[in-house]
């Protein structure tokens, strides 16, 4: 039997709430480009963390109001019309739905004795919204990329997470994320990780994994 699971950690976008790709899809239709191209313009490559403006935003290196102009060269390079309101439209409030089953799972895990965590690639200006829909009181640890200056899939952010959990054995931590690159990043440093496509399927996978070892209590 593997190590006893002590902690379960959740991403925010695409796990606790519906993914930002939904907003990108709506905007792509208006701009007359594919979702894939617009996502590349807005968010850069998902398999790495580099100098793309969105990556810098999520590391807290630039402010949200700088993003629109910073992305203009990326849009021009891919012949995407850039009208000046794209970032505001994608990040406008009220465009997502909370997965209530994830919130209930987090509460249940704490009742069963597991430690819970949030690990999110987020934006400094988004913090009030993040805390509203994922209250810190639900979690033992709360890791926001824009606060710690690291973002998934950088190995260093998983080290920050483990330090916050005071956990020396990464295999005792399960992480749920909707981006394959982030799942692979977590696994590369020894965490157990579940890719979230359908939330209910991911929760079933989590319960199967937890059933292989006794409850943390």
Which stretches of residues belong to each language-model region?
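N-terminal helical cap/lid subdomain that shapes the substrate entry/recognition surface
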Residues: 2-103, 111
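Short glycine/serine/threonine/alanine-rich loop segments
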Residues: 33, 114, 191
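Proline- and acidic/polar-enriched loop/turn elements at helix boundaries
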Residues: 40, 69, 87, 121, ...
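Conserved, well-ordered alpha-helix/loop/beta-strand core segments that scaffold catalytic motifs
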Residues: 109, 114-115
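Phosphate-binding loop of NTP-binding sites
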Residues: 118
């Amino acid at each position: 039997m593997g190590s006893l699971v002590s902690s379960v950690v959740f991403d925010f976008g695409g796990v606790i709430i519906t993914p930002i790709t939904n907003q990108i899809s709506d905007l792509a239709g208006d701009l007359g480009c594919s979702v894939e191209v617009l996502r590349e313009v807005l968010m850069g490559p998902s398999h790495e963390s580099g100098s793309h403006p969105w990556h810098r935003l999520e590391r807290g290196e630039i402010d949200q109001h700088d993003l629109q102009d910073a992305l203009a060269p990326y849009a021009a390079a891919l012949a995407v019309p850039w009208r000046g309101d794209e970032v505001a439209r994608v990040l406008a409030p009220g465009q997502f739905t909370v997965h209530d089953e994830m919130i209930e799972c987090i509460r249940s895990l704490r009742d069963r004795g597991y430690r819970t965590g949030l690990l999110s690639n987020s934006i400094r200006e988004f913090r009030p919204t993040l805390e509203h829909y994922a209250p810190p009181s639900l979690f033992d640890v709360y890791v926001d990329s824009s606060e710690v200056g690291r973002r998934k899939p950088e190995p260093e952010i998983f080290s920050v997470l483990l330090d916050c959990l005071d956990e020396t054995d990464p295999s005792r931590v399960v992480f749920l994320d909707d981006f394959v690159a982030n799942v692979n990043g977590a696994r590369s440093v020894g965490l157990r990780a579940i890719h979230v496509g359908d939330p209910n399927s991911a929760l079933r996978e989590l319960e199967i994994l937890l059933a292989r070892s006794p409850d943390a209590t």
